[in-house]
Every structure is written in C-alpha cells, then in structure tokens.
C-alpha cells in the first residue's frame, strides 16, 4: 500500500476548504494515515523546498508557505502518489482538469491549494520530513 504526502496550503486553509479537500481524497479511496495542522517556520519551509533553492520562485514559495497554517497529511492507498497527483490536477489551476482540487480551489500557479509528492521516492522523503513513523497509522481500507 503506497503512501504519499499532501499539504493543504495556506490559501485553502484560510478559505476553509480543508473539509472539502479531505472529502475528495476519501471519496477517491485514499485514506488519511497521519494529519496535523502546522504553521511552518522559514527554516521548515526552506528545508522542505530545498530542491527549489536555486529556482527564481523559491523565496516567493517560502513566503507563501509561511503566510498561514497548513494541513499536512499522509495519504495511503493503492497507487497513492499517482491518484493524489490526478486529484490535485495540473500545477497551474487554469490548466487543471475540471473538478480537480486545483481547478476548484487554486488561484494561480503559485497559489494553487495543495502540494503532493511527485514520486514514491520523494513521498518517502517528504513524509519523513513531517512525521515520525510512530505518528503514521496504517489504515485498513
């Protein structure tokens, strides 16, 4: 059973879309194995997005991710990484499939509602960034 990391970003938390987004995951068969709400520090956001450190949007991304609380989740299920990516939709909400999370709740390529791991390898790294193994409950689906 695969696991992937999902983050409901500050824009969606601030607009009270948490429940709607979680419902989309659960209706698709993904289960929540761990979840917490946190307000990331600059250090935490920079550490999480370190792979983008040399990209021109890095500081804007960090500033956005520390602008308010986020909900961090471990989603679990068959093909969890790919299913989460499909449910999220394209990074740019204008290009995201109708009914996808980003099409429904995203505003722009930078303010796009959610983050999701892009591979199994990155999912393992990202999950361990936010959660200890003892915090993850292997749900039975």
Curated annotation (Swiss-Prot):
Keywords: ATP-binding, Cytoplasm, Kinase, Magnesium, Metal-binding, Nucleotide metabolism, Nucleotide-binding, Phosphoprotein, Transferase
InterPro entries: NDK-like_dom, NDK-like_dom_sf, Nucleoside_diP_kinase, Nucleoside_diP_kinase_AS
Domain of life: Bacteria
Known catalytic reactions: a 2'-deoxyribonucleoside 5'-diphosphate + ATP = a 2'-deoxyribonucleoside 5'-triphosphate + ADP; a ribonucleoside 5'-diphosphate + ATP = a ribonucleoside 5'-triphosphate + ADP
A GO CC term attached to the entry: cytoplasm
GO biological process: CTP biosynthetic process; GTP biosynthetic process; UTP biosynthetic process
Annotated ATP binding sites: 9, 57, 85, 91, 102, 112
Enzyme class: transferase
Cofactor: Mg(2+)
Keyword Heme tagged: no
Enzyme Commission (EC) number: 2.7.4.6
Subcellular location: Cytoplasm
Active site: 115
Annotated S-S bridges: none
Record GO terms (molecular function): ATP binding; metal ion binding; nucleoside diphosphate kinase activity
NCBIfam families documented for this protein: PRK00668.1
Subunit field text: Homotetramer.
Physiological role: Major role in the synthesis of nucleoside triphosphates other than ATP. The ATP gamma phosphate is transferred to the NDP beta phosphate via a ping-pong mechanism, using a phosphorylated active-site intermediate.
HAMAP family xrefs: NDP_kinase
Annotated family: Belongs to the NDK family.
Protein's UniProt name: Nucleoside diphosphate kinase
Organism expressing this protein natively: Chlamydia trachomatis serovar A (strain ATCC VR-571B / DSM 19440 / HAR-13)
């Amino acid at each position: 059973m695969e696991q992937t990391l999902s983050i409901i970003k500050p824009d969606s938390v601030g607009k009270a879309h948490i429940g709607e987004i979680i419902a989309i995951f659960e209706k698709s068969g993904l289960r929540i194995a761990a979840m917490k709400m946190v307000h990331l520090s600059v250090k935490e956001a920079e550490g999480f997005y370190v792979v983008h450190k040399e990209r021109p949007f890095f500081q804007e991304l960090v500033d956005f991710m520390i602008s308010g609380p986020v909900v961090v989740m471990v989603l679990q299920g068959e093909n969890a990484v790919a299913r989460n990516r499909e449910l999220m939709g394209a990074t740019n909400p204008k290009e995201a499939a109708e009914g996808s999370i980003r099409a429904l709740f995203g505003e722009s390529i930078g303010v796009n509602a959610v983050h999701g791991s892009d591979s199994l390898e990155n999912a393992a790294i990202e999950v361990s960034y936010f959660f200890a193994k003892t915090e993850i409950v292997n749900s039975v689906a």
